[in-house]
């Protein structure tokens, strides 16, 4: 499955628009990790537990988008976007794009 943030795919022609695909995941933060992250934010640096949670969320959302696009008969998703909303103890990641059928552009062979 091709997934791209652009509206076009290099070397491919979009032959059919199948429709919008969306997916979201809401995760709660672990209280112990939240405390450690709070301490880390005081001294600076990457909050690795949050980074891991976000990467896991993104992977799950992408897998769901692919499943939904495949059910529509698509072989690509264009215009892919992600939005993150962080609450006090939760975060929600939403992914959406347009499921399409894309075919390779046939080049004419020189004579």
Curated annotation (Swiss-Prot):
<dbReference type="Pfam" id="PF01906">
    <property type="entry name" value="YbjQ_1"/>
</dbReference>
<comment type="similarity">
    <text>Belongs to the UPF0145 family.</text>
</comment>
<protein>
    <recommendedName>
        <fullName>UPF0145 protein RBAM_010660</fullName>
    </recommendedName>
</protein>
<dbReference type="InterPro" id="IPR035439">
    <property type="entry name" value="UPF0145_dom_sf"/>
</dbReference>
<dbReference type="InterPro" id="IPR002765">
    <property type="entry name" value="UPF0145_YbjQ-like"/>
</dbReference>
């Amino acid at each position: 499955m091709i997934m791209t943030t652009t509206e076009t795919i290099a070397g491919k022609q979009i032959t059919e628009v199948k429709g919008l695909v969306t997916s979201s995941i809401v995760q709660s933060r672990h209280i112990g990790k939240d405390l450690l992250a709070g301490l880390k934010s005081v001294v600076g640096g990457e909050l690795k537990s949050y980074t891991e949670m976000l990467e896991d969320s993104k992977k799950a959302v992408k897998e769901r988008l692919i499943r939904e696009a495949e059910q529509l008969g698509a072989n690509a998703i264009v215009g892919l976007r992600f939005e993150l909303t962080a609450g006090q103890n939760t975060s929600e990641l939403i992914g959406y794009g347009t499921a399409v059928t894309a075919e390779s552009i046939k080049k004419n062979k020189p004579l």
